[in-house]
Design a protein with these regions (language model features):
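N-terminal amphipathic alpha-helix/helix-capping segment at the start of soluble metabolic enzymes
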Residues: 1-27, 127-128, 271, 304
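Catalytic alpha/beta core domains of metabolic enzymes, predominantly
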Residues: 123, 138-141, 146-318
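Nucleotide-binding motor/catalytic cores of P-loop/tubulin-like NTPases across gene-expression machines
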Residues: 322-338
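Conserved beta-strand positions in the central sheet of alpha/beta enzyme cores
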Residues: 54, 100, 134, 178, ...
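Conserved, mostly hydrophobic/aromatic
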Residues: 24, 81, 135, 179, ...
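Short, acidic/polar
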Residues: 32-44, 84-90, 162, 218-227
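Active-site beta->alpha loop and helix N-cap motifs at the rims of alpha/beta catalytic domains
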Residues: 46, 50-165, 169-170, 186
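Short, well-ordered coil/turn segments that N-cap beta-strands
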Residues: 18-22, 49-51, 74-78, 95-97, ...
Length: 338
């Protein structure tokens, strides 16, 4: 396995990048303001030894819940997902170790302000509270300006968005950041991260195949991407995104560590013949954005109902939220959005 060349950044008590161990993380799938359910979810992920736990915050009730939860889990390393409301950054920053923002979401809110002004608002909150930042680019919610500019190359649209945001943070004197470029197709994840790392080899990368779906298919998609990237020295922290019941979310950590161990020891698993040529069911891993958790059952039902079509080149997307749901279903032959 080729050694990584990225700089080290600090997320609370954790370091990633450079020669630091590759961190394995997951995300709470419950609505944050549901304290009982979210407490249970954090306990599940801590029991699985998650290095970082990501929690989404969308409104003031979530912020109040986050404040209570932090008192219960003072030692946990937490990342917060700002969703579509970047203005929550200074309110949540005192309770977390990393802030994740999606460049595509900044386009829609407060259009009278420039993207740079919005990014600077987040950066200032991170600086004042000693937080790291993740620039999280997702194929389902790329900034429309980049989608239009690179309409013939969706991977380049993601890469250019990420590189430009890195430049903004650099110009603002902020270096404690990492980047993610996620797609539901393994090949595009590989391509995007390779392109980015060639241009910015110094920036730590968070790897993941978004909406990978149900196991075992979702595990195979993730393994394909991770094997190609990590063996080449690309990747500093990982997330395995699987569509699972909340109490089983610890499996994401277990699977992630198994994949890392296999790569480190030179064991590359064979992929089933024609795996990427037939039916492709995309399903999100659930998070606090989901308003109807029945979508996990729906994804399982869809797989059973479509067994007859497994040889056909079709994509069915089963989404659970308003954030990536619309974008991910755009390119699917059939989209189901709870």
């Amino acid at each position: 396995m080729i050694s990584r060349k990225t700089r080290k950044i600090r997320i609370g008590k954790l370091e990633i990048g450079g020669d630091s161990p590759i961190a394995v993380q997951s995300m709470a799938a419950t609505q944050t303001q549901n304290l009982e359910a979210t407490t249970r979810q954090i306990e599940v992920l801590e029991a699985a030894h998650a290095d970082v736990i990501r929690i989404a915050v969308d409104n003031e009730k979530d912020v109040q819940a986050l404040r209570v939860l932090r008192k219960q889990f003072p030692e946990s390393v937490w990342s917060v997902d700002l969703q579509e409301n970047y203005r929550l950054a200074p309110i949540v920053a005192p309770f977390v170790d990393k802030i994740r923002y999606n460049p595509g979401h900044l386009f829609h809110l407060e259009k009278e302000k420039t993207i740079r002004e919005k990014v600077e608002f987040i950066v200032n909150a991170a600086k004042e509270n000693d937080c790291a930042i993740r620039i999280g680019v997702n194929c389902g919610s790329v900034d429309p300006d980049y989608k239009e500019r690179y309409k013939d190359d969706s991977v380049e649209a993601m890469v250019r968005s990420a590189v430009d945001h890195c430049q903004m943070l650099d110009e603002m004197g902020f270096e404690n950041y990492c980047v993610s470029l996620k797609d539901s197709e393994s090949e595009k994840v590989i391509d995007a991260n390779r392109r980015f790392s060639q241009e910015r080899p110094d920036v730590p990368l968070h790897l993941g195949v978004t909406e990978a779906g149900l196991p075992p298919e979702g595990i195979i998609k993730t393994r394909i991407a991770f094997e190609q990237l990590i063996s080449a020295g690309i990747g500093d922290t990982i997330r395995v995104s699987l569509t699972l019941p909340n109490d089983d979310k610890g499996q994401e950590i277990k699977v992630g560590r198994e994949i890392l161990k296999d790569i480190e020891e030179g064991r590359f698993r064979s992929v089933p013949e024609n795996f990427l040529e037939g039916l492709n069911i995309i399903a999100c891993p659930s998070c606090s954005r989901v308003e109807n958790d029945k979508f996990v059952d729906l994804a399982q039902d869809v797989r059973k109902m479509t067994e007859y079509a497994e040889k056909y080149k079709l994509t069915i997307a089963v989404m659970g939220c308003r954030v990536n749901g619309p974008g991910e279903t755009d390119d699917a032959d059939l989209g189901l959005w709870c």
